[in-house]
């Protein structure tokens, strides 16, 4: 479960912050 979320989150969170 978490493994599937970590991937997208690592790509989305930095993208939103920038």
From Swiss-Prot:
Keyword Secreted: yes
Modified residues (Lysine amide): 18
Protein's cellular compartments: Secreted
Chief location category: secreted
GO cellular component: extracellular region
Tissue-specific expression: Expressed by the venom gland.
Annotated keywords: Amidation, Antimicrobial, Secreted
Reported function: May have antimicrobial properties, like most ant linear peptides.
Protein name listed in UniProt: U1-poneritoxin-Da2a
Record organism: Dinoponera australis (Giant neotropical hunting ant)
């Amino acid at each position: 479960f978490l493994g599937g979320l970590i991937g997208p989150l690592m790509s989305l969170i930095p993208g939103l912050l920038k």
